[in-house]
UniProtKB/Swiss-Prot annotation:
Pfam families: TPR_11. Residues 626-635 have a biased composition (Polar residues). Residues 498-508 have a biased composition (Basic residues). The gene is TTC14. Residues 36-56, 439-458, 464-550, 569-635, 690-747 are annotated as: Disordered. Keywords: Isopeptide bond, Phosphoprotein, Repeat, TPR repeat, Ubl conjugation. One of its GO terms (molecular function) is nucleic acid binding. It comes from the Eukaryota. This is Tetratricopeptide repeat protein 14. InterPro entries: NA-bd_OB-fold (IPR012340), S1_domain (IPR003029), TPR-like_helical_dom_sf (IPR011990), TPR_rpt (IPR019734), TTC14 (IPR039190). It comes from Homo sapiens (Human). TPR repeats lie at residues 210-243, 307-340, 342-374, 382-415. Residues 590-599, 612-623, 690-703, 711-742 have a biased composition (Basic and acidic residues).
Length: 770
């Protein structure tokens, strides 16, 4: 109930309306509380008395008051109140949403006096007025009003109503200029009502927007053009030129009147609900009628009856087999009524027969939504779901098939086809899971077997590789022994044949001395070898590998020193006496000094692995060196035999010399033969490192003195110099000097290992003596 509107009505009509409302609306619970407060004095402004000069027509309209009292529950209801916000009328005039007409009094020929009184009665502060400047004074300017810019539309152009705009209400357009200098007489001004004197009919206006209400504050005040005048004023001017036009003709000629959305626009502007419009006629109130009596429900019934006719025609086509025509009729029925259940069920059945199960399921589900109690729709939907589940089961989409079966059971729990299909699917899924598990176990076993077989293969390959290495070692050792034997036999045969051809006086001169030395050296060497075999003990396990590695380093160090000195002597010897240089290359097969220290290192490695054997490539190198020096060998084979025998005697003499100065410590190697050979070679390198250059220089001097003598005498002198020129004191000093230099060059850990080995050998020797 709109209490403000009721209070205004009671203030206007007085106590007579109040008594009528009490008698008519006594049963209305809303009016009981309101009428009690309405009887009190009104809180609003006091009722306005008729103005002086107005004719007294105080006739109480009892019929209007009776009408208000009878329709009070409808007139003062909140549904009549406008909910639309107040908008600017100036902006709406520019758009022809509805027919905008001239003021009504222009067609009614109302006297100017009455129109003037009505204007001053209805005008309020904040209303917008439009006029022309008539005069400009120092305190402001006067303007004659021609129309209203807001509120009620009035025809005031001929009433000559003036308004004053004071200087304080005129905004300045420059900082130091006169604000009134901007305006001229005849300018059209839009201003807001600031003050009203209804008794003297005087108005004061302002050009500041602060004088306007909030909903009109956006309107521009000041000078405007004729095009900005309100639309109703322009049409009233046109009507004055042609006064014969009627109100109806003007309304129909306007563009907004023929607008198709004019009703919706006006209802929205007035705040009236279109779906539940209020009416003052009791019989037309919407609450007094049922929903089936309204147009929307009647339209649905009508469209449903038309759709059923199309469905019947489509069913007839379907029975005959004309599926295309049946589908067209079903689609036509659904165009008329989109939610027609029968049309949806019939079209779904047609889709199912064609094989489009998904479309059929959609139609059946939509039919069940519109009518949940439709039996055929439920039945057909369950059957279609089971059929679709079977298709998915064939495609091995078991989870989707299971969901379709469950949907069918949710719609109808007694549907046996869906229940049986679901049980079969569960059994099949269990079997498939078991098979997958078994297959996974088999794959795991196969993987483990593959891993085991690969490991076994690797083991076999390693064993085979070890076996092949052993075979290769045996073959290399046997080949080296055979090659050494062959080389010795070949050298002995060649030397014997060449020795026969040698001259007799040379052989008789040197044979006696050499034979005596050979026998003595052989006897002493055999005795020393026997003693070494008796005194040799195995090396401790924890020092053998490291000692061998360090021993090889020692041999490399000694070999470098010997190689530098020996290469110099070899170059000089080869340049001056090719025969002696070729004879010096022969001892490589018998453990003598070689030209390259790497040969000594290789011979040491092979002799440590297998006793009494040498590398086969030494003999090959021996024969290759012999082939390289064949130019000097082939000249005289007797010279070769003589040099070979002389070298044997040289070796035997050195053995005797080494046995005299040999220390008591035992040589450390894996076998006695290899240890003896390695010790001899090391001692030989030590000795040659200090005395080789001196011996060779002495030999070179003798070689120069005896150049005119025979070739055989030079060789004898060379052999005898090697055997006899080294005294015992020089040998001892050179040996000590070489050992001290090696010890200085060796690292501390290697020296410690040598000391431990020497102590170990001493302990073994003491135990054997005891």
């Amino acid at each position: 109930m709109d209490r403000d509107l009721l209070r205004q009505s009671l203030n206007c009509h007085g106590s007579s309306l109040l008594s009528l409302l009490r008698s008519e609306q006594q049963d209305n619970p809303h009016f009981r509380s309101l009428l009690g407060s309405a009887a009190e004095p009104a809180r609003g402004p006091p009722p306005q008395h008729p103005l002086q000069g107005r004719k007294e027509k105080r006739v109480d309209n009892i019929e209007i008051q009776k009408f208000i009292s009878k329709k009070a529950d409808l007139l003062f209801a909140l549904s009549w109140k406008s909910d639309a916000p107040a908008t600017s009328e100036i902006n709406e005039d520019s758009e022809d949403h509805y027919a905008i007409m001239p003021p009504l009094e222009q067609f009614m020929e109302i006297p100017s006096m009455d129109r003037r009184e009505l204007f001053f009665r209805d005008i309020e502060r904040g209303d917008i007025v439009i006029g022309r400047i008539s005069s400009i004074r120092e305190f402001g300017f006067f303007m004659v009003l021609i129309c209203l810019g807001s509120g009620i539309m009035r025809d005031i152009a001929h009433l000559e109503i003036t308004a004053l705009c004071p200087l304080r209400d005129v905004p300045s357009h420059s900082n130091h200029g006169d604000p009134l200098s901007y305006y001229q007489t005849g300018d059209i001004i839009r201003a807001g009502i600031k003050d009203i004197d209804r008794y003297h009919e005087k108005l004061a206006v302002s050009l500041y927007s602060s004088s306007l209400p909030p909903h009109l504050s956006g309107i521009k005040l000041g000078v405007i053009s004729s095009e900005e005048l309100p639309l109703y004023y322009r049409r009233s001017v046109e009507l004055n030129s042609n006064s014969l036009e009627s109100y109806e003709n003007v309304m129909q000629s306007s563009l907004g009147f023929v607008n198709p959305g004019v009703v919706e626009f006006l209802l929205e502007k007035l705040g009236i609900d279109e779906s539940n419009p209020p009416s003052l006629m009791r019989g037309l109130q919407s609450k007094n009628f049922s929903e089936d009596d309204f147009a929307s429900a009647l339209r649905k019934k009508q469209s449903a009856s038309w759709a059923l006719k199309c469905v019947k025609i489509g069913v007839d086509y379907f029975k005959v087999g004309r599926h295309v025509d049946a589908m067209n009729e079903y689609n036509k029925a659904l165009e008329i009524d989109k939610q027609n259940v029968e049309a949806l069920v019939a079209r779904g059945a047609l889709y199912a027969t064609k094989g489009s199960l998904n479309k059929a399921i959609e139609d059946f589900e939509l039919a069940l939504e519109n009518c949940p109690t439709h039996r055929n729709a439920r039945k057909y939907l369950c059957q279609t779901l089971v059929e679709r589940g079977g298709q998915l089961e064939e495609e091995e989409k078991f989870l989707n098939a299971e969901s379709y079966y469950k949907k069918a059971l949710a719609l109808d729990e007694t549907f046996k086809d869906a229940e049986d299909a679901l049980q079969k699917l569960h059994k099949y899924m269990q079997k498939s899971l078991e098979l997958r598990e078994k297959q996974a176990e088999k794959e795991e076993k196969q993987k483990t077997k593959k891993i085991e077989t690969s490991a076994e293969k690797l083991r076999k390959l390693l064993k085979e590789e070890k076996r092949l290495k052993k075979k290769r070692r045996k073959s290399t050792s046997s080949s080296s022994v055979s090659s050494a034997d062959e080389s010795v036999s070949s050298s002995s045969s060649s030397s014997s044949s060449g020795h026969k051809r040698h001259k007799k006086h040379k052989r008789n001169r040197s044979e006696s001395s050499r034979s005596s030395r050979r026998h003595s050296s052989r006897a002493s060497s055999n005795q020393i070898d026997q003693n070494r075999k008796d005194e040799c003990y195995p090396v401790p396990a924890n020092t053998s590998a490291s000692f061998l590695n360090h021993k090889q380093e020692v041999e490399k160090l000694l070999g470098k020193q010997d190689r530098l000195q020996y290469e110099k002597t070899q170059i000089k010897e080869k340049d001056r006496c090719p025969l002696s240089s070729s004879s010096l290359e022969i001892p490589d097969d018998f453990g003598g000094r070689s030209e390259d220290p790497r040969d000594f290192y290789n011979s040491y490695k092979t002799q440590a692995g297998s006793s009494k054997t040498e590398k086969p490539y030494k003999s090959e190198r021996h024969f290759s060196s012999r082939r390289n020096s064949s130019d000097s060998f082939c000249r005289n084979s007797e010279d070769k035999i003589y040099g070979y025998r002389r070298f044997e005697k040289d070796i035997e003499g050195r053995k005797e010399h080494y046995r005299r100065w040999e220390p008591g410590s035992v040589r450390h190697s894996t076998s006695p033969a290899s240890s003896e050979y390695s010790w001899k070679s090391v001692e030989k390198y030590k000795k040659y490192a200090h005395s080789g250059s001196r011996d060779f220089s002495r030999h070179e001097q003798r070689y120069r003195l005896n150049t005119n003598q025979g070739e055989y005498e030079r060789e004898d002198n060379y052999g005898e110099d090697i055997k006899t020129e080294v005294p015992e004191e020089d040998a001892l000093s050179s040996k000590e000097h070489s050992e001290s230099s090696v010890k200085k060059n060796l690292p501390q850990n290697l020296l410690n290992i040598f000391n431990q080995i020497a102590e170990f050998e001493k302990e073994k020797g003491n135990k054997s003596k005891n």
